[in-house]
């Protein structure tokens, strides 16, 4: 039997689930335990196909709009946050609802409301159509928030009063891209009000930094995450910028060994909504084909946890 070729695998750390994702999944699981199935979930609880399929098997029913859920069953709002109109509609229907919005997304909602109450014109840096952006813009009256996606958008933005502008951001953006947009806004509007603490969340930042640390040494980077996961897509982009050929895959089945022909070092990471079992699946598949030397590249320690809603605590 021919010997397997050697392959160094650099495993990014931190990777995978963040505290907000962990909390959101627990909310659905505990709601099913407490209230029985079905429990309805408005939008995918987190953007990962494997997580969604597992929760479906437990008794979760995923819908895109609240009117697709019956009045007499619990409904959970996804980790990405929802416009104010959604809980208002649930209350008017006397529905039992549980809000799994990540507390760090809720922080952005509070900031946006504070700026609005202070009479500032608000800029949201984010990706059009992403549920988090829809939810943040939906905290305020229509037209109160201007969405900016690029430096070009920042240069074209024309506020009513250049001295009275504030910005907030989506939590799952590219740290580097966002810094460029913020720099452009600050250059144009020196008095622009900024978040007290950066809106891009600790987990997004840490995972991007971990990718930078391994992608500079790896020829190929494999990112585990679904294509609709903003933070996972950003990890692949960060890897490419750092010089690696980066591929975003759902699971080990998506691994193409032609990517690894002539490759000595591969980096592996997972987006904040991707379970660790998917990483292990890739490592197992690599070990079938290669003599793997595994190195964990630890760039940060995460100790953040978030409390469950009172209705499910204990």
From Swiss-Prot:
Task: Name what cofactor the protein needs.
Answer: [4Fe-4S] cluster
Pathway info: Isoprenoid biosynthesis; dimethylallyl diphosphate biosynthesis; dimethylallyl diphosphate from (2E)-4-hydroxy-3-methylbutenyl diphosphate: step 1/1; Isoprenoid biosynthesis; isopentenyl diphosphate biosynthesis via DXP pathway; isopentenyl diphosphate from 1-deoxy-D-xylulose 5-phosphate: step 6/6
Entry keyword annotation includes Oxidoreductase: yes
- Residue positions annotated to bind (2E)-4-hydroxy-3-methylbut-2-enyl diphosphate are 47, 80, 130, 171, 229-231, 273
Signal sequence extent = none
Where does the record place the catalytic residues?
Answer: 132
Protein name per the record: 4-hydroxy-3-methylbut-2-enyl diphosphate reductase
Please tell me the species this chain comes from. Phenylobacterium zucineum (strain HLK1)
Q: Which gene name does the record give?
A: ispH
């Amino acid at each position: 039997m021919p010997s397997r070729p050697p392959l160094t695998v650099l495993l990014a750390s931190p990777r995978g689930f963040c505290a907000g994702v962990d909390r959101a999944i627990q909310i659905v699981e505990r709601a099913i335990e407490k209230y029985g199935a079905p429990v309805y979930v408005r939008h995918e609880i987190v953007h990962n196909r494997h997580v969604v399929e597992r929760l479906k098997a437990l008794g979760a029913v995923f819908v895109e709009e609240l009117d697709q859920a019956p009045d007499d069953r619990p409904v959970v709002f996804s980790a990405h946050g929802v416009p104010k109109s959604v809980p208002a509609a649930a209350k008017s229907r006397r529905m039992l609802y549980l809000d799994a919005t990540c507390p760090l997304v809720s922080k952005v909602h509070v900031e946006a409301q504070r700026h609005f109450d202070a009479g500032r014109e608000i800029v949201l840096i984010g990706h059009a159509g992403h549920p988090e952006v829809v939810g943040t813009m939906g905290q305020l009256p229509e037209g109160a928030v201007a969405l900016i996606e690029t430096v070009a958008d920042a240069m074209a933005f024309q506020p009513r009063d250049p001295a009275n502008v504030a910005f907030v951001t989506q939590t799952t953006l590219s740290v580097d891209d966002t810094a460029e947009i913020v720099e452009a806004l600050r250059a144009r509007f020196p008095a622009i009000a900024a978040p007290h603490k950066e809106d891009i969340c600790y987990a997004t930042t840490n995972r991007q930094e971990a990718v930078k640390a391994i992608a500079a040494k790896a020829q190929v980077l494999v990112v585990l995450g679904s294509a609709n996961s903003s933070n996972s897509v950003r990890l692949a982009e960060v890897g490419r910028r750092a010089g690696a050929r980066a591929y975003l895959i759902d699971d080990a089945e998506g691994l193409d060994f032609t990517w690894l022909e002539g490759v000595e070092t591969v980096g592996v990471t997972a987006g904040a909504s991707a379970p660790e079992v998917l990483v292990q699946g890739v490592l197992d598949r690599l070990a079938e084909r290669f003599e793997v030397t595994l190195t964990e590249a630890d760039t940060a320690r995460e100790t953040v946890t978030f409390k469950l809603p009172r209705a499910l605590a204990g």
